[in-house]
């Protein structure tokens, strides 16, 4: 029997929390990668039965289809308010929102800032791809200066459209936040750290994940990743902006 069965070191496996269903995201989209990272962290922490996610309006509106945990859908931009209610009702739960730049940094700016300022023990996962992906590639609050979209075809002009909103830098200045960081899709450690801080009752955490939208950017997945590294990271540098944990 020992000659037939050989011991192997497991390098990778699909998280058991990931449902076996096709994703609706465009090929090359970063959302699928981030979903996997979130699932891995929840499993590592043993919080499968005590996690509650709040879905946004936007490309990730169907996130509840893909991770086998409890979910609640929220009205556009209101995910932090919904998460606040859930966490106050069930303080022993790991409660997080999963939001894009339009949902969080435009229509949901009020709910986001005030939840963070109150120090609600929730985690906000913020996907920043600098464009509105679901509705056709319009300019977002985070669209870079000079970046072309369907609603600013000549590029974002500060004198006309204003400057890109650095919502994460704003969050770092608030008294209620304990951990604010900006990372990219290869950084799983930041998500776990934020989840652990939430469960310890240390305050609000915001994890921005700089991502791609190859469909909205009109680039191939490979070119989109290159563009992200060459342009996005210059204006949205990676790293911890606040850490009081």
List where the protein language model places each region.
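Thiamine diphosphate
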Residues: 57-133
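Short, hinge-like loop/turn segments at secondary-structure boundaries
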Residues: 69-72, 115, 140-144, 198, ...
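Glycine-rich beta-alpha junction loops
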Residues: 57-59, 129-131, 187, 210-216
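Active-site diphosphate/adenylate-binding microenvironment
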Residues: 6-7, 14-75
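Short coil/turn connectors at secondary-structure junctions
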Residues: 21, 47-51, 90-95, 117-123, ...
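Glycine/aspartate-rich loop-and-adjacent alpha/beta segment that forms the canonical ThDP
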Residues: 2-3, 190-191, 197-245
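Short catalytic-loop micro-motif centered on adjacent basic/acidic residues
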Residues: 25-27, 97-99, 178-184, 206
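Conserved thiamine diphosphate
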Residues: 13, 140-201
């Amino acid at each position: 029997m020992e000659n037939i069965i050989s011991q192997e070191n497991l390098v990778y496996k699909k998280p058991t929390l990931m449902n076996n269903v096709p994703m609706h995201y465009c090929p090359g989209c970063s959302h699928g990668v981030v979903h996997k990272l979130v699932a891995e962290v929840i499993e590592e922490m043993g919080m499968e039965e005590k996690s509650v996610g709040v879905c946004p309006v936007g490309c990730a509106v169907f996130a509840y289809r893909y991770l086998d945990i409890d979910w609640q859908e929220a009205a556009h931009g209101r995910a932090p308010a919904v998460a606040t209610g859930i966490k106050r009702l069930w303080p022993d739960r790991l409660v997080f929102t999963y939001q894009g730049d339009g949902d969080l940094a435009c229509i949901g700016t009020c709910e986001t800032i005030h939840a963070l300022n109150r120090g609600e023990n929730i985690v906000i996962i913020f996907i920043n791809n600098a464009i509105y992906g679901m509705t056709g590639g319009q300019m977002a609050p985070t669209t870079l200066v000079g970046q072309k979209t369907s609603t600013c075809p000549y590029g974002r002009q500060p004198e006309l459209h204003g400057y890109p909103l650095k919502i994460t830098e704003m969050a770092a200045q608030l008294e209620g936040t304990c951990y604010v960081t900006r990372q990219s899709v290869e950084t799983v450690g930041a998500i776990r750290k934020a989840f652990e801080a939430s469960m310890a009752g240390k305050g609000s955490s915001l994890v921005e994940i700089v991502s791609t939208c190859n469909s909205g950017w009109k680039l191939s997945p490979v070119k989109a990743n290159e563009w992200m590294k060459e342009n996005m990271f210059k204006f949205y540098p990676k790293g911890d902006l606040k850490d009081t944990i």
